[in-house]
């Protein structure tokens, strides 16, 4: 179990450092920067690369919602959930801390949103609480369905990380304007702790909505999937 939790920590660390790091450090540099498209691909690439690197050890969850969804679908023992989630959250916080140290080394650094997730006035596009809730539930549910389907025994071995990484890229392309894209409570927690204030007060949604989406996906997969 120690090896599994260690790589969940490392995988989540890489997801936050690579994904949020691209948003904080490179999205607008130089001038236009990598923009929404680049940030979306960065998040997808972090999952793709670490799924290949360490997915064979822990399953490559890197996300509390993924762990919960897999448990509901019967793909992992519920007793492992607490350990996985703690490893993921601590990995995200550690990555946010490293990113803060790097970003604050720039003379004109301003904390701003620090890639935190938000709704209302803190939504990149000014979307409401309801829009944010629906977006996070639906996007997380489909992310889990992609994971559950692509890792099924019927699917050729070795292709799942590609489908999952591209799926996460697509999710970011759609939902960055709405919530800055969470679908991952650990990722949201790390950034919120450094932003504080509004990011902390809105953090509940980025736990509740992804977990609801994950549970829905797990139940749907038990109905339409074929894990027997």
UniProtKB/Swiss-Prot annotation:
Which species? Rhizobium meliloti (strain 1021) (Ensifer meliloti)
The protein here is known as Aquaporin Z 1
A single GO cellular-component term from the record reads: plasma membrane
| Role noted for this protein | Channel that permits osmotically driven movement of water in both directions. It is involved in the osmoregulation and in the maintenance of cell turgor during volume expansion in rapidly growing cells. It mediates rapid entry or exit of water in response to abrupt changes in osmolarity.
Q: Where is this site: Selectivity filter?
A: 43, 172, 181, 187
Catalyzed reactions per annotation: H2O(in) = H2O(out)
Q: Does the keyword Transport apply?
A: yes
Task: Give the GO molecular function terms.
Answer: water channel activity
Asked if the keyword Magnesium belongs to this entry, the reply reads no
């Amino acid at each position: 179990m120690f090896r599994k939790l260690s790589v969940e920590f490392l995988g989540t660390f890489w997801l936050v450092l690579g994904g949020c790091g691209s948003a904080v450090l490179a999205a607008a540099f130089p001038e236009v920067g990598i923009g929404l498209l680049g940030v979306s691909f960065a998040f997808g690439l972090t999952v793709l690369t670490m799924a290949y690197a360490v997915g064979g050890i822990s399953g490559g969850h890197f996300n509390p919602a993924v762990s919960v969804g897999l448990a509901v679908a019967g793909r992992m023992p519920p007793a492992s959930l607490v350990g996985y989630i703690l490893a993921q959250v601590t990995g995200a916080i550690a990555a946010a801390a490293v990113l803060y140290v790097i970003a604050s080394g720039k003379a004109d650094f301003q904390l701003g949103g620090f890639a935190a997730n938000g709704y209302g006035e803190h939504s990149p596009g000014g979307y409401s609480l309801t829009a944010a809730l629906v977006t996070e539930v639906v996007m997380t549910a489909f992310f889990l369905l992609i994971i559950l389907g692509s890792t099924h025994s019927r699917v050729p071995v070795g292709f799942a990380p590609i489908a999952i990484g591209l799926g996460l890229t697509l999710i970011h392309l759609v939902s960055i304007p709405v919530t800055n894209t969470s679908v991952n409570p650990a990722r949201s927690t790390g950034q919120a702790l450094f932003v504080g204030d509004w990011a902390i007060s809105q953090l509940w949604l980025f736990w509740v909505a992804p977990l609801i989406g994950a549970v829905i996906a797990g139940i749907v997969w038990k109905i339409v999937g074929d894990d027997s």
